[in-house]
Amino acid sequence: MTTMTAERAPRIGMVSLGCPKALTDSELILTQLSAEGYETSKTFQGADLVIVNTCGFIDDAVKESLDTIGEALAENGKVIVTGCLGARTGADGGNMVRQLHPSVLAVTGPQATQQVLDAVHRNLPKPHDPFIDLVPGGMGIAGLKLTPRHYAYLKISEGCNHRCTFCIIPTLRGALVSRPIGAVLNEARALFAGGVKELLVISQDSSAYGVDMQYRTGFWDGQPLKTRLLELVQALGALAEPYGAWVRLHYVYPYPSVDALIPLMAQGRVLPYLDVPLQHSHPEVLRRMKRPASGERNLERIQRWREVCPEIVIRSSFIVGFPGETQAEFEHLLDFLRAARIDRVGCFAYSDVSGAVANDLPGMLPMPLRQERRARFMAVAEALSSAKLQRRVGATMQVLIDAAPGLGRKGGVGRSYADAPEIDGAVHLLPPEKISKTLKVGEFTQARIVGVRGHDLLAQPI
């Protein structure tokens, strides 16, 4: 651990694990600490104190979080734990983190910014009060970001009103709480003004935005605006247009209200991309999961979306081997996948999540069978994806550049509208043919698709 001197500000190390929602919590914590005069450290050894924002949803995430806490304690010694794992109980009913790592300075659950700040202040007094606008260039409202400068996550709500039997998120993060629409749009405007070229809208359930407020009318720039996803997306599209920026929607449940968003995608006002967590297709499995929609309605809805916007890309996640899943129910899922032609897929073999109702459902399947079904599912999904990628060869696409070595003369890596960062594929860019052409991170380029490389595309910048 570094010894702090009077000549420099105290330094905070931050590790953010888990989903983009947790990442935005980490950004909020760091924004406030930076406003108070704390500096950040990229290493445990260079920090005076380390904050670990944990994930506690599935067993692998719990292990990663606990291992990271142990590593931070070993290399630094002063550790504050926050996030979903901080709200989990151990075998004896006590706090899991406290049981396994009793030397941590403090433990909080998710969305506990003030508690984390209080713990930091107790253990590493703040150098000054936050009387300044934090980031130049219009970014003060948006705060610090842990993503690359050209894209950012915009969290529109917290918590979830669903009680899916495989999930403990409502226990960890509570019921749905939507952000005021004016606050969301102010942050979006600041992000665009600060150079963000892609805004990724996230929450636990984006389709339900405003339900807890009964869609009441808010105000933004002196104009009335209903707190509802349609109005929010319309306003985000209008904000993005002058900057030529993208708006990408995540965690959108297939409610009837989502149908109104598809014409906006067809008109080019937001990206024709939807992240829709379907989880399964068979009505009986969805009933056991307590999911809010049926597989038949989902298939019909996706088909209607494609009629309105043929270019739409659908990403989804699925669970196979759920308790009681029969062979016929699994085959139903494979048939659904083929019929729906899902573009991007994530699939998990069901695993116990401590505290989830599904753990006590009858018909728990052997893990080898769950893994076998996942492998079969992914084989079908990858064949569908490969065929769709092959059809893009010869097309010209807009690509947002994420990496450009050699001053932009050696090619690079970017993404098309069909690719969300970290979870989807990429577009590998060849070196520009024109001497005058260079690639720059955070800027767009037109590229001609010349080949397919696994889940990715190969393209020649134009």
UniProtKB/Swiss-Prot annotation:
Major place of residence: cytoplasm
Cofactor: [4Fe-4S] cluster
EC class (word): transferase
Matches recorded under PROSITE patterns: MTTASE_N (PS51449), MTTASE_RADICAL (PS01278), RADICAL_SAM (PS51918), TRAM (PS50926)
Residue ranges constituting the Radical SAM core domain according to the UniProt record: 146-388
UniProt entry keywords in alphabetical sequence: 4Fe-4S, Cytoplasm, Iron, Iron-sulfur, Metal-binding, S-adenosyl-L-methionine, Transferase
GO BP terms, alphabetized: tRNA modification
One Pfam family per UniProt: Radical_SAM
UniProt keyword tRNA processing present: no
Amino-acid positions noted as binding [4Fe-4S] cluster 1 in the UniProt annotation, renumbered to this chain: 19, 55, 84
Catalytic activity, EC: 2.8.4.4
Coiled coil regions, renumbered to chain: none
One GO cellular component term noted in the UniProt record for this chain: cytosol
Family: Belongs to the methylthiotransferase family. RimO subfamily.
Protein name listed in UniProt: Ribosomal protein uS12 methylthiotransferase RimO
Species for this entry: Verminephrobacter eiseniae (strain EF01-2)
Taxonomic classification: Bacteria, Pseudomonadati, Pseudomonadota, Betaproteobacteria, Burkholderiales
Annotated gene: rimO
